């Protein structure tokens, strides 16, 4: 009993003492040291950083007439070999390839001003997801089959991670002419 009385009085004494230095109130990330008062004496503008004249070769993408769609749309059209490399990357990451197609290759709204199900965000899936696919040539063959069945439609390949339940990659495999 005496030992418990001693512990409670010691705790009361510890609480009554002044605040510790690490218990001061938060001071909103202010530094106690002011910024240096010295300024750069040189007002010469030639010392400013430069991108080395690369501005003259930069181009602005035209906002009309050349729509961009998916991940790789700023590249030139992908050849069959390029598509196979992308599908190999998709398969190496253990993603499930899926093929989708749509008449319109971009988001549009024709029925209502607010977003909805029929505004181009969801494409029609070509057959079923290719679970267990291990060869890029199988995916390319399905893309070719979709192109033959719907030559005026856009065809895209998506990579779905079935462990995390997310779509990880999506790119246009075929654009109609």
UniProtKB/Swiss-Prot annotation:
Chief location of this protein within or outside the cell: plastid
InterPro entries named in the record: RuBisCO_ssu, RuBisCO_ssu_dom, RuBisCO_ssu_N, RuBisCO_ssu_sf
Stretch forming the transit peptide: 1-56
Pfam families cross-referenced by the UniProt entry: RbcS, RuBisCO_small
Assembly with partners or alone: Heterohexadecamer of 8 large and 8 small subunits.
GO MF terms, alphabetically ordered: ribulose-bisphosphate carboxylase activity
Keyword tags: Calvin cycle, Carbon dioxide fixation, Chloroplast, Photorespiration, Photosynthesis, Plastid, Transit peptide
Protein species of origin: Lemna gibba (Swollen duckweed)
Domain of life: Eukaryota
Gene3D superfamilies: Ribulose bisphosphate carboxylase, small subunit (3.30.190.10)
Protein name (database record): Ribulose bisphosphate carboxylase small subunit, chloroplastic 4
Function according to Swiss-Prot or TrEMBL: RuBisCO catalyzes two reactions: the carboxylation of D-ribulose 1,5-bisphosphate, the primary event in carbon dioxide fixation, as well as the oxidative fragmentation of the pentose substrate. Both reactions occur simultaneously and in competition at the same active site. Although the small subunit is not catalytic it is essential for maximal activity.
HAMAP family: RuBisCO_S_bact
């Amino acid at each position: 009993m005496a030992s418990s009385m001693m512990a409670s009085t010691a705790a009361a004494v510890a609480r009554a003492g002044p605040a510790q230095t690490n218990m001061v109130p938060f001071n909103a990330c202010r530094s106690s040291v002011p910024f240096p008062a010295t300024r750069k004496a040189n007002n010469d503008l030639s010392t400013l950083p430069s991108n080395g004249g690369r501005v003259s070769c930069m181009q602005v993408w035209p906002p009309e007439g050349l729509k961009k769609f998916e991940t790789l749309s700023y590249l030139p059209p992908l050849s069959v070999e390029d598509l196979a490399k992308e599908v190999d990357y998709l398969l190496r990451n253990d993603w499930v390839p899926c093929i989708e197609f749509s008449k319109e290759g971009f988001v549009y709204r024709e029925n209502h001003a607010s977003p909805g199900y029929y505004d181009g965000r969801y494409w029609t899936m070509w057959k079923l997801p290719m679970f267990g696919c291990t060869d890029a040539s199988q995916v390319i063959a399905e893309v070719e089959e979709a192109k033959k069945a719907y030559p005026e439609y856009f065809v895209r390949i998506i990579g779905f991670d079935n462990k995390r339940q997310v779509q990880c990659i999506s790119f246009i495999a075929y654009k109609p002419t």
